[in-house]
Amino acid sequence: MLFKKKVLATSVALAFAGTVAPAFAQTDDQLEGVDQIEIEEVIVLGGIRGSLKRSMDIKRDSAGVVDAISAEDMGKFPDANLAESLQRITGVSISRERGEGSQVTVRGFGPEYNLVTLNGRQMPTHSASSRSFDFGDLASEGIAGVQVYKTGRADVPTGGVGSSINISTTRPLDAPGQKMSLSAKMVNDTSTREGDKITPEFSGIYSNTFANDTIGIAITASSQTRNNGVNSASTTGWFTRAGDHSGAGGIPNDANQVNRSQSADEFSSIPQQIAYSIAEYETTRTNGQVVLQWAPTETLTGTLDYIHSEHDLDKKMSDLSAWFSNASASSQSSTWNDGAQRSPLMYAETHNFADFAMGLHQDGRKNTNESIGLNLEWDASNSLSFALDYHDSSAETGANNPYGTSSLVTIASFNKVASAVYYGQEMPVLVQSLNSGADGADRPLYKNDMVVTGSVFTNDEARMDIEQAKLSGVFEFSDSSSIDFGFQMTEVNNRFASRNVQLDNWGGFTQPGELSAVIDRSSMAGQFDQISGGNDPRQQTEYFTADIADVISVAEASYTARGAAYAQVGDCGTGYCASTDWNADKRSTEETTAAYLQLNHATEFVGKPVNIQVGVRYEETDVTSAALAPTYSDVYWLGGNEFTMVEALDADGNAIQAFDAYTGDYDMVLPSLDWDIEVAENVVLRASYSKTVTRPSFTDIQGGITVNSTSFKNTGADASGGNPGLVPIKSTNYDVSVEWYYDEGSYLSVGYFEKDVANFIGSSVREGNLFNLNWPLGGTLFNEAVTASGIDPLKYTEVGAYIFANLADNAAVQGDRIYGVNGDPLVSFKVQSPANQETAKVDGVEINLQHNFGETGFGMIANATFVNADVSYDNMKIDSQFVLNGLSDSANLVAFYDKGALQARLAYNWRDDYLAGVGQGAGTYTNPTNVESYGQLDISASYEYSDNLTIFFAGLNVLEETYNVYGRDKLQVLQVGQTGARYDIGVRYSF
């Protein structure tokens, strides 16, 4: 396949030599395995059309199914956010944070199933538990292109059942000479209430070569600041019960419940808590990269690169909320919709002066990514070449302020006598009845009613380090045959540490009136005007806000005045800040050795060009995981059916914790086969077979065992832990597609894919002894009491009473406790841990049309993906069930104009409803979290004022779409919110 090796080098050189200065394109090393064809003549195109043509050429000339995005011009990617650009690719959907693209789903497989590499190198993530990459950390200005490998290949790193996504950056020797591009823009985010309406963004890229183009340097830098707001209404979780349920947490079956479900095969769900929140965010991104290249000879090139990115996110949020006590309320009333799965149209409770809570949040997080790498390429002969690549990369995250990564200080008035919530519109309508006056009439809030209640300061830090070395080579037997080979060693170290500082003063701590000087009356009226029901006049909108530091000062002064002790303290010495004295510390190490062979062969079949690529990859991985966990020394019995574990303490009374380490290992063989034939002129038929894997999450492979509760009954204790012995989730993939390249920059493709996936992770339970704990049940003293008294040994309360009355002088009896002693039975633990159990089949169809309307400058892209699976969430089950998260159809429609000095684009992206996960944070733990379908229109335009100066404009979410997250049906709102539109205007100067 030698004739496919030269197109990128040729087109890149011509592109940079051209007057239009298009993108820094990808090198052969960066696009390792993306096969190419040599062409006689290259017409250099920049802008939208040039970017789309380069992406089309990569797709056409690749083995397997590969889609790509190329920069439109030097320092100009199609979107300011990489994830926003990726969603334009067929089969790729994204999730958004604060209205901005964050993570990707490919062919129905969520972020944790997609591997992200940078210049072919596996990149670390800072998500602590999963392997999901956050594209929000990287600015797009220094990116030359992105390639999405949808089928497996032997020479592509493993880790992506959904896809492997490679991000390519600049290389100065690919485009000799001096080039520079500087840009500045103003960003107007319409969603912010308190932040600066206009924030700046700056970026620059510089590339130059010296010494007859044998030495090169490229420098990229960018700085972004953005203020935005998110206004949301949420239900923190739903309790789902069968119609015949009459136990705790149920719904009374009386006249106050209208249309309540009645039978065991009908279900009703009631909310746990309703909250309205106003959040303000300030985001700062700083990105930089330096690339140095030296080619001392025509056959040897060395590249040293360093990449650094920082992403600071600060949040201030205030909220008001109503907690529903359900069966503990004074009374309940409800009205329900019809159907087997019933949701409330109205749910109400009365209370005996319960709390009306308002939360204050102020926290922040800083993400830092660093990577340094060295690459050496050596052409040993005309037919043999080698590449040595090494990198050391890290990603870390942690708090950037004293309040930790998440904080909550609550203030409340204890004058709530009734709460009601009305569903049926997009926004749940919360109605509060407040009464603290003697006349019994509803009354507004007064400052003197407010007191400080509970608080939580959560803090964590995470870091992942990846050290990777790879030796690869290509041996060309002839112009039509070659073999790729390689050997790679990778070490991944992941650590996550955390601690909560929590004061459970939910019944109130300070005295009424102490907060009056520091709180301000506020209103949420008009803050949900884009949401149906957001301006309902019944809503509770009045509440109080404050600076969290002022409220903390009042609370700390109250503690001091009372001489009260804090239940927990943070680094500041009080209970009102975060702590870095971690009590949870989880660490994992993966060491992987891999080798691969890949045969490439070009031939003909009945006169038609055929390309075949056959490969195999072998990997061995060793896993070591350790976690810091409490240890226990004793078990005591109070005489009933409750037993309690005693945490082990040192001589100073401090808890003894130990790192509990576990190991695992696995190996795997991953074959791949790609075949394509040009069945007619410009019509390519393609078929692929491969096996790909995704490794288990770091939560699933964590070491250590955590006791679920220190109190347990006669049946034994419960605990949970990870399982480093898990093997990867493995997919067998089949792809077939037909592609018609009918004109310059235009094509139509239709593809079918199928994935048979095994080793999905479920849960298993094993029994065993932990900590060598003796308990008195069935022990020497217990049996002595049973024998002497003749009491039935199953009547634990009577046996315990006999021991206290007649055997209290035994050493095992200490006060009101009976301890287990040596020789007594060991406590049996049921330990729940992850296990490879489940299988699933996913298939789908991808359709893509890209069309240029001749020389008019107009063009369009339309694509859609339809995905199916043989597993889905069953709304008529309450028990645990296996599901696939993120599965959804998606579509894109893009119209563009690119001619002369003017470029413009309208892009509409749509994603259907999808299951985001099981569990809602509260309520029934098996309830689903679904995301409603979402469509967004973005616009952009640029005008080349001169050969050097370009003026550009962009608008994101210009229709100001809102988002909706729901439970078992759309009446069960979990969150609905509005983020607003964002507009950019700026200039770019290139020379």
Would you name each region that the model predicts?
Residues 505, 719, 775-778, 782-786, ...:
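C-terminal beta-signal and terminal closure region of outer-membrane beta-barrel proteins
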Residues 83-122, 150:
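Extracytoplasmic beta-strand/coil segments of soluble accessory domains associated
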Residues 122-150:
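Short acidic/polar hinge/loop motifs at secondary-structure boundaries
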Residues 757-759, 909-919, 942-991:
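C-terminal beta-signal and adjacent terminal beta-strands/loops
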Residues 163, 169, 185-187, 198-209, ...:
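Outer-membrane beta-barrel transmembrane strands
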Residues 367-369, 588, 693-751, 755-757, ...:
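Outer-membrane beta-barrel signature, preferentially recognizing the C-terminal barrel domain
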Residues 756, 761-766, 772-920, 954, ...:
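Gram-negative outer-membrane beta-barrel transporters
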Residues 26-75, 111:
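Short, acidic, small-residue-rich periplasmic hinge/interaction motif at the N-terminus
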